[in-house]
Amino acid sequence: MKVLLIDDVLATGGTIGAAIELMHRLGAEVVHVLALLEIDGLQGRALLSAKYPDIPISSLVVS
């Protein structure tokens, strides 16, 4: 199963990272992450990109 993971806020990356791990344990493939708002100063995107380099991340608004 392929999954588009959508979250309201990308800050530190903790919630999205946990969701990706859960999807992997359930046998799903996360094909993209979409955040409605990204808080750039907290470096969540950098953390997620380093840990999951094959999963693209998009944000509608970056603050």
Where are the model-predicted features located?
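Conserved G/P- and acidic residue-centered "switch" motifs that form tight phosphate/ATP-binding loops
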Residues: 8, 13
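PRPP-dependent phosphoribosyltransferase catalytic core
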Residues: 17-63
